[in-house]
Amino acid sequence: MAGLGHPAAFGRATHAVVRALPESLGQHALRSAKGEEVDVARAERQHQLYVGVLGSKLGLQVVELPADESLPDCVFVEDVAVVCEETALITRPGAPSRRKEVDMMKEALEKLQLNIVEMKDENATLDGGDVLFTGREFFVGLSKRTNQRGAEILADTFKDYAVSTVPVADGLHLKSFCSMAGPNLIAIGSSESAQKALKIMQQMSDHRYDKLTVPDDIAANCIYLNIPNKGHVLLHRTPEEYPESAKVYEKLKDHMLIPVSMSELEKVDGLLTCCSVLINKKVDS
């Protein structure tokens, strides 16, 4: 039935596509606000630890794409593809400087034999950071980077699921203040704009979600995985970075909790979900 989806399989993943970060990120990555300079060497170490958690610790097959110095934002792979089941939508990122990032991602997803759909419409923009998939439906943030036409193409691509749009007034993306922390659990920041967006999502949906409210909007961006033999796994920001939000995550007794630092990439709007595209490939029987 449309919109119902397959919640039982939510969070399952066999592969993660990531991309190394270029030196050019330090000076040339897009950022919503001027601030501290990125320590690129430290950003690289944090990124390597993140990739290590997905691969070595959790056993996903990691496909690591090389950095491209002409694409300073290319480490943020989430924005260039939305993958659901065996279908991958190659997006048309809202920032023109990021459009060429899709090429290498498309190639990688073709090698994984996914069904590829490309967003060709020049009136459409969509960043994957604006796409929240709950396992039952999609919410798409309408932001500076994602427009209505982009949301319509996503809805056409994933016809089995309901798609609702949510205005994003503050913050770069919808997932700058929310994400899924479990099969039925939305992690949400405490700001007025985050709470307003949650209210809209609740009104749009036929389903009642549980919510996990954290004090810091940025810390509401986490990665939930359902890993065989490990169960519920949650990557969240460290207590050193966001102590009060970490305390909220620590109350999730059914989850294997893995704190991960992202302080350097955060300076250029990078959050945990931004740095991977997670894929659940069916095992050939």
UniProtKB/Swiss-Prot annotation:
Reactions performed catalytically: N(omega),N(omega)-dimethyl-L-arginine + H2O = dimethylamine + L-citrulline; N(omega)-methyl-L-arginine + H2O = L-citrulline + methylamine
Top-tier EC class: hydrolase
Active-site residues (renumbered): H173, C274
Record keywords: Acetylation, Hydrolase, Metal-binding, S-nitrosylation, Zinc
Domain of life of the native organism: Eukaryota
Residues modified to N-acetylalanine: A2
A Pfam short name: DDAH_eukar
Activity sensitivity to pH: Optimum pH is 8.5.
Modified residues (S-nitrosocysteine): C222, C274
Keyword Zinc: yes
Binding site for substrate: L30, D73, E78, D79, R98, R145, V268
UniProt GO MF annotations: amino acid binding; catalytic activity; dimethylargininase activity; metal ion binding
Any one biological process term the GO annotation gives: arginine catabolic process
InterPro entries per UniProt: DDAH-like
EC assignment: 3.5.3.18
Residues binding Zn(2+): C274
Regulation affecting activity: Inhibited by zinc ions. Enzyme purified in the absence of 1,10-phenanthroline contains on average 0.4 zinc atoms per subunit. Inhibited by 4-hydroxy-nonenal through the formation of a covalent adduct with His-173. Competitively inhibited by N(5)-iminopropyl-ornithine.
Tissue-specific expression: Detected in brain, liver, kidney and pancreas, and at low levels in skeletal muscle.
Cellular component GO terms, alphabetical: cytosol; extracellular exosome
Family: Belongs to the DDAH family.
Function: Hydrolyzes N(G),N(G)-dimethyl-L-arginine (ADMA) and N(G)-monomethyl-L-arginine (MMA) which act as inhibitors of NOS. Has therefore a role in the regulation of nitric oxide generation.
Quaternary assembly: Monomer.
Protein name listed in UniProt: N(G),N(G)-dimethylarginine dimethylaminohydrolase 1
Source organism per UniProt: Homo sapiens (Human)
